[in-house]
Amino acid sequence: MRTKYLAVPALLLVLAGCGQQPAPPAAAGHASTQATATAGPPPVVAWTGLAAIDPCALLGPQDRSAAGVGVLGKPKEIAGARACDWTVPGTFGVTVTLSETDGLADLEVAKKTATKTKVGTHPALQVADKKAADGTCAVLLGVGDAASVQIDVSNTGFSDTPLACRRAGTVAGLVEPKLP
């Protein structure tokens, strides 16, 4: 899945109207000088609550057992987004990706492959190209207007797309209650 990055112009507009943060007090024994660049915390794009979530912690031992995943997840980064990958050798793989900047409406999804649905209290899209029958499926969960969680499943051998969608749906159902 590729995402659009339309939030940048809006972010720049919002930041242009923000005031300058005061500089933190100087540490004892150091001279305090005011630099021309502002010091302080980086600007916050939008608080979604996803920033506090470790994607690998979204599937605990009981969740992994329920999803048929007997391995620990490995943290990774996908296009700047935090993710976790679980690979069950010879069977399938699951990747959960947290996007703190792209809501469901921002994601580029071919309409012919997406089905609107709901997982728990979150709006969702199930994405699978049934004609390709490539053993892959994704469930995208909307978290507010500006964030999303993507659950991707790929079957070993790239076959049985319906099974991949069942697995993605199971993982989405386990992850969803832990989302803001």
Regions found by a protein language model. Give the residues of each.
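Short, solvent-exposed recognition patches
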Residues: 66-126
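Short, low-complexity, disordered segments immediately C-terminal to signal peptides
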Residues: 7-44
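A short, solvent-exposed beta-edge/loop patch
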Residues: 115-180
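Amphipathic alpha-helical segments
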Residues: 53-72
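Positively charged n-region of N-terminal signal peptides that target proteins for export
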Residues: 1-4
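Extracellular/mature segments of secreted proteins
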Residues: 62-67, 91-95, 145-146, 172-175
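Sequence contexts marking disulfide-bonded cysteines in secreted/extracellular proteins
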Residues: 19, 55-57, 83-87, 136-138, ...
